[in-house]
């Protein structure tokens, strides 16, 4: 535990690893050296961070199985992310949470569908009542001559001299 908090120890181990790798792989044409060094540094960091964390978690936690499972899943997910995979490992607890969320969303949507169906039924009933009221009334013949637009229209007998004043007359034009 003391070595985990000792920054100088951690930095000296990383420097030692880099120096060792440089001496092993002295070939300047080695293209994979940065990748190998990165992987080794990540593995070293995971080792140094996870073991003391798990020891503390196991001592302080009541349920050590869940802590171990969570730590292992987190480590594998980190390795998968570093490898470039988008998929992640999930535990049963996470799956149950997601299923609960999906079931909750489905219930909400079913309630909304039920409300919409009820509204549609009410609208159909309202339209039926309106249609029934319109069909019950009998429409008699309406005298279209007495409508607003037809009041000032005169018939041929009512015009003076019996001539239509709006009829076009012959017009001669001068050239």
UniProtKB/Swiss-Prot annotation:
Name the source's superkingdom.
Answer: Viruses
- GO BP annotations listed: monoatomic ion transmembrane transport; symbiont-mediated activation of host autophagy; viral process
Q: How is it modified after translation?
A: The N-glycosyl content is primarily Man(9)GlcNAc, with a small amount of Man(8)GlcNAc.
Subcellular localization is given as: Host rough endoplasmic reticulum membrane; Host membrane, Host caveola; Secreted
**What organism does this protein naturally occur in?**
Rotavirus A (strain RVA/Human/Australia/RV-5/1981/G2P1B[4]) (RV-A)
**Written domain comment of the UniProt record:** Binds 1 calcium ion per tetramer.
SUPFAM superfamilies attached to this UniProt entry: Rotavirus nonstructural proteins
Name of the protein in question: Non-structural glycoprotein 4
Chief location of this protein? host cell
InterPro entries noted in UniProt: Rotavirus_NSP4 (IPR002107)
Q: How does it assemble?
A: Homotetramer. Interacts with the immature particle in the viroplasm. Interacts with host CAV1, early and late in infection. Interacts with host integrin ITGA1/ITGB1 heterodimer. Interacts with host integrin ITGA2/ITGB1 heterodimer. Interaction with microtubules blocks trafficking to the Golgi apparatus.
**Its biological purpose:** Plays an essential role in the virus replication cycle by acting as a viroporin. Creates a pore in the host endoplasmic reticulum and as a consequence releases Ca(2+) in the cytoplasm of infected cell. In turn, high levels of cytoplasmic calcium trigger membrane trafficking and transport of viral ER-associated proteins to viroplasms, sites of viral genome replication and immature particle assembly. The secreted form acts as an enterotoxin that causes phospholipase C-dependent elevation of the intracellular calcium concentration in host intestinal mucosa cells. Increased concentration of intracellular calcium disrupts the cytoskeleton and the tight junctions, raising the paracellular permeability. Potentiates chloride ion secretion through a calcium ion-dependent signaling pathway, inducing age-dependent diarrhea.
What cellular component terms from Gene Ontology apply here? extracellular region; host caveola; host cell rough endoplasmic reticulum membrane; membrane
| Pfam families the record matches | Rota_NSP4
> Which keywords does this chain's UniProt record carry?
Activation of host autophagy by virus, Calcium, Enterotoxin, Glycoprotein, Host endoplasmic reticulum, Host membrane, Host-virus interaction, Ion channel, Ion transport, Membrane, Metal-binding, Secreted, Signal-anchor, Toxin, Transmembrane, Transmembrane helix, Transport, Viral ion channel, Virulence
**Residues that, per the record, bind Ca(2+):** 120, 123
State which ranges are Lumenal (membrane side): 1-28
Carbohydrate-modified residues are: 8, 18
Q: Transmembrane segments in this chain: where?
A: 29-51
Q: Cite the GO molecular-function annotations of the record.
A: channel activity; metal ion binding; toxin activity
């Amino acid at each position: 535990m003391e070595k985990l908090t000792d920054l100088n120890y951690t930095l000296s181990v990383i420097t030692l690893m880099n120096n060792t790798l440089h001496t092993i792989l002295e070939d300047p044409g080695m293209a994979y050296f940065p990748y190998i060094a990165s992987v080794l540094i990540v593995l070293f960091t995971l080792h140094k961070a996870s073991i003391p964390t798990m020891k503390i978690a196991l001592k302080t936690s009541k349920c050590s199985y869940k802590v171990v499972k969570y730590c292992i899943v987190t480590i594998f997910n980190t390795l998968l992310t570093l490898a470039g995979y988008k998929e992640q490992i999930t535990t049963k607890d996470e799956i149950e949470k997601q299923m609960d969320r999906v079931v909750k969303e489905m219930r909400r949507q079913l309630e909304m569908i039920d409300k919409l169906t009820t509204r549609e039924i009410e609208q159909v009933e309202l339209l039926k009542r309106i249609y029934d009221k319109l069909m019950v009334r009998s429409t008699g013949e309406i005298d279209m001559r007495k409508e607003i637009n037809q009041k000032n229209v005169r018939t041929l007998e009512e015009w003076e001299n019996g001539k239509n004043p709006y009829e076009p007359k012959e017009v001669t034009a001068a050239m």
